[in-house]
Amino acid sequence: IARSNPSTPLSAETGGKNAIILTASGDRDHAIMNVVASAFGNAGQKCSACSLLLVERSVYEDKNFREKLKDAATSMKVGSVWNPGNVVGPMITNGNDKLLKALELEQGESWLVPPQFLDKNKYVLAPTVKWGVRPGSYSFRTELFGPMLSVVCIENLQQGIELVNSLDYGLTSGLQSLDEEEQRLWKNSIMAGNLYINRGITGAIVNRQPFGGMKLSAFGGGVKAGGPNYCACFVKISDKPGSTTDYKQSYPKAYEQEFAH
């Protein structure tokens, strides 16, 4: 649209490669719950879904943590959306070339939970976890839009922040840490539009949490959907001398709801 008519006002949210960082001070069980919900809910087909899990080395090397993450992923109910007990349903397409390429291992990678299609047409992919993903690799940098989580080992929070900020996208991001200093550092340093601490990174609520990002996750004015200036780039605002509006008289119900208390 912008190429055919550059003067056309255009604002868009364009995707994400979203990460959660888990430090040694985080509640591991709580973090696993948040990660699998963010990565595999809606079969990973949300622009806000968690695609990367960056784990501090002491946690990354903990066999108990690995087994709990594996168990959480494999315990999710997968199948038809007509079965209300299923949490992970089919993908919108079986021709997602980016995802299919990511289902191949690169150097140093292994499967914590290997890919498994549950139907012959390959629309239903069970939650998949790739272990040992390296910064800069295909799975690290590419938005996959499917139920696959890539786990990366980091030395500390600062390195994790730098790796997340090196991504081309900046939509949602999460931190699992109980350390207030780590939370402060992360909030002041991370480059993403919607930030979440010790909770999942999907599910922004309309009219409560404006949603949008930066870098390749946004195009246009950079304002968030649901925010007060979302449509500002499509209108011209000007003052007319001598023209005022008595909002209390013109919009009595709205005025009362807003200012009565």
PLM features per residue range, with description:
Residues 1-134, 158, 197, 243-261:
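ALDH superfamily catalytic-core signature
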Residues 21, 33, 72-78, 117-119, ...:
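Conserved C-terminal structural/oligomerization subdomain of aldehyde/semialdehyde dehydrogenase
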